[in-house]
Amino acid sequence: MADNSGTEGEEEDCSEAERAGGWFMVEAIVDRRTGDTISSDEDEEDEGEDMVDFIDDRPIGDGQEVAQELLLQQAAADDDEAVHTVKRKFAPSPYFSPVCVPSIEHELSPRLDAIKLGRQSSKAKRRLFQLPDSGYGQTQVDTDTGPSQVQDGCETGDQNGRQQYKEGSGTKDGENGSQEEERAGGDGEESQPLSTETEKGACGVLSILKASNQKATLLGKFKEQFGLGYNELVRHFKSSRTACVDWVVCVFGVYCTVAEGIKQLIQPLCEYAHIQVLPCQWGMTVLMLVRYKRAKNRETVAKGLSTLLNVPESHMLIEPPKLRSSPAALYWYKTSMSNISDVYGETPEWIVRQTMVGHALQEVQFSLSEMVQWAYDHDITDEGTLAYEYALIADVDSNAAAFLASNCQAKYVKDACTMCRHYKRGEQARMSMSEWIRFRSNKVQGEGDWKPIVHFLRYQNVEFIPFLCAFKLFLQGIPKKSCLVFYGPADTGKSYFCMSLLKFMGGVVISYANSHSHFWLQPLSEAKMGLLDDATSQCWSYVDTYLRNALDGNVMCIDRKHRSLLQLKCPPLLITTNVNPLEDDRWKYLRSRLQVFTFSNPCPLTSKGEPVYTLNDQNWKSFFQRLWARLSLTDPDDEEENGEPSEPFRCVPGQNTRTV
């Protein structure tokens, strides 16, 4: 009989078992393939039972993955808690000051924190704050025996957690309440909440700092630590926006490591730093005298140090130092040499000036003559200008520094301006017109061009030679030739021409609007040249009635306020007008006293609105230098040969130099 194994024969004599057995026997026999290499480290008897569960082919939703996911979540929670514990140990919280650190014992074990080894005194003590009356008749002494309930930011989270726990389970609330009552002694007295214990720690300090007299608490702590008042070292700025370079900063509740690190962190921001670090029950107290590279206000300083020190701004005292207090300067100087201070940078000049022996010897008494000499050299006769400008040089001038330290500054300024005006008036009265023009020319810086003045006169159809002759007699003060009148319509440059000349000569302006006063001519007594601008018909009538002798160039009498009458020769006078005084018969007696020049053409302007012909001090200086001989002005070399002094005026006493 043929072998039908592995075929699909249909013979009836072949049973199902035989046909099926043939297939299974073939598969069972072929258990090893030809050419396969079996590793020596494998077990020949290994049937692969350990790889049965390698592929998870369980149906979804049988409930076993819930336990596995829960295990993973618990492991992750344990890891996070371990990391959080390490962080709390080595990295302080950025949201709380170290004054909250003592409350950690209470948070971890409130019952252990309630145990006290010492006795709590029942005597009444002086309180900085008055406790509110509870309404149950307890006295202040009774209230003092038990801690008061204070809710601060550092305990809010724990209290909220306990409250939610009690509200969530009513049965446990009752059980806990009975247990606490038994621990308290079983006398039925209601136990204090757990949050009341935190006030005994450093969190009570936060409640004090948040009170209305927070600054008083900090000032008291400062005096307790440093032995002197904070206000003795600083001056007060009412506004927090006022900028200053030097600041005195005291910070409370700083971590020890941060307090040591601020000595290096503050150096790139400032030019000078004086730092003192002292321990305190709130943490470390840092006192700094800082000179920043740029001026800062109180808000900027507070924000910067709050970031560096990790302390809220409410724990800081920030004020500028006293710059003129010798005790304050001596404190900073002496503490800088001790071992409790770390100093960086160059000592500020206000400390050096008040502590060093050399600078102390250089302090001199204020001399009014030096102030007058300075005002004379800078041509300052106004009191406000003198006070401000002289105060600016106090850092480089010892007399100015003594002036600022004086209590009579207003008197000194007034006296200095008065004396300076007297010297200027005497100097001007002594000079001739030639000397005065030379004196004014020496004060003008730069060189100009005299041609624009000549071109402007020609543009107005004014002959230059007749004008030059009249101007020569005008400067010499010849009788009836000492008044020049410039007549013409509006916008012809009359006032522009006269004002430029008056500015160069240092003259004065009188106005007919003040003619109702007896003293309106008083400025003419202190000038070499005057100007009456825009004379009207009423003004010409007044001049014809009262000022004929003034136009003559003779001696006249002038009334001065709070002074006696003064007799003087009227200085050369310029008058601008829109009325021709030579054409009106009412003023016929003024015709021989006036020299009139007519400006008939409008003053030309550029596209920018500036005059085409520039009339400034430099051009007038060039004009006088060019026409010095034509105007018959005296040569300065001739004046020195006649014995006139060539040295500048000096009002400060000194020693005469003698040649050996």
Swiss-Prot record:
Q: Where's the motif Nuclear localization signal?
A: 87-89
Report whether Nuclease shows up as a keyword of the record: no
A Gene Ontology biological process in which this protein takes part is: DNA replication
A family per Pfam: PPV_E1_C
Region (Disordered), start-end ranges: 1-60, 128-196, 635-660
Name one molecular function that GO assigns to this entry. DNA helicase activity
Q: Which InterPro entries match?
A: Helicase_SF3_DNA-vir, P-loop_NTPase, PPV_DNA_helicase_E1_C, PPV_DNA_helicase_E1_N, PPV_E1_DBD, PPV_E1_DBD_sf, Rep_E1_papillomaV, Znf_lg_T-Ag_D1_dom_sf
Cross-link Glycyl lysine isopeptide (Lys-Gly) (interchain with G-Cter in SUMO) residue location(s): K569
Modifications the protein undergoes after translation, according to the UniProt entry: Phosphorylated.
Q: What does this protein do?
A: ATP-dependent DNA 3'-5' helicase required for initiation of viral DNA replication. It forms a complex with the viral E2 protein. The E1-E2 complex binds to the replication origin which contains binding sites for both proteins. During the initial step, a dimer of E1 interacts with a dimer of protein E2 leading to a complex that binds the viral origin of replication with high specificity. Then, a second dimer of E1 displaces the E2 dimer in an ATP-dependent manner to form the E1 tetramer.
Full protein name: Replication protein E1
| Source species of the chain | Human papillomavirus 29
Gene of this entry: E1
